[in-house]
Amino acid sequence: MSVSDWLMQFPIAHRGLHDISLGVIENTISAAQRAIDHGFAIECDVQSSADGIVMVFHDDTLDRLTGRSGKINQLNCAQLELTELLNSKDTIPTFVTFLEKVNGRVPIICEIKSEFDGNLELAEKTAQAVRNYRGPLAIKSFDPLVVAAISKLIPERPCGFIGESTYDDPEWDFLSPSQKKSMACLTHLDQTRPDFLSWYINDLDQGPPQLARKLLGLPLMTWTIRTNENLQKAREYADQIVFEGFIPESPHQSE
């Protein structure tokens, strides 16, 4: 499907419009509400609980944002819903609860986390959760297999591939050289057929994302915009931003 205008219209608040100084933590209902109040779209991340419930949370471990340690997939949904986030009254929400709270008021861009092990259960359950959601919503993932699966499971929802050009951060050491090359050079496009791309700001002006944008007509968003310098680069090379740490003006306000 073609990407709807709404996906490129409103700047996207990275994990919601969070601000720890205000007690508003990433990927919470409070962060979503603050984004809604400012008229921004919301990016959120989903992981699976031990009992297979789709939860809104970025890290695969609880340590950074809660008073607990260990992996998120070692606790069940009930335990996670009672887990308070540091410096906040929020707890970890289910994806279904998150959808109910947003209720179509602004677009949601949901990133499906993956361990790149071929397990598509989280993708399947995420697709099931959004089937009856009436608001604007798109899916994206770093994992080409997840992108391909979502595109088949819910073709009515825009689905995008998240990429970068080097994959030289240690977090990507588990990937083979051939996987990194395929993802960086977008050689998987015939299989994944994404509706849009989401590319790392530092690599935004590189050949693959720009060729895909100009020759294939793939809309291009970029992450994560934290400075005015990056914002100017994004305006030159991309169609949409995922931002954090400041309040950008709407592109329509600057016209």
Predicted regions and their residues:
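Phosphate-group recognition and catalysis centered on beta-loop-alpha active-site segments
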Residues: 1-255
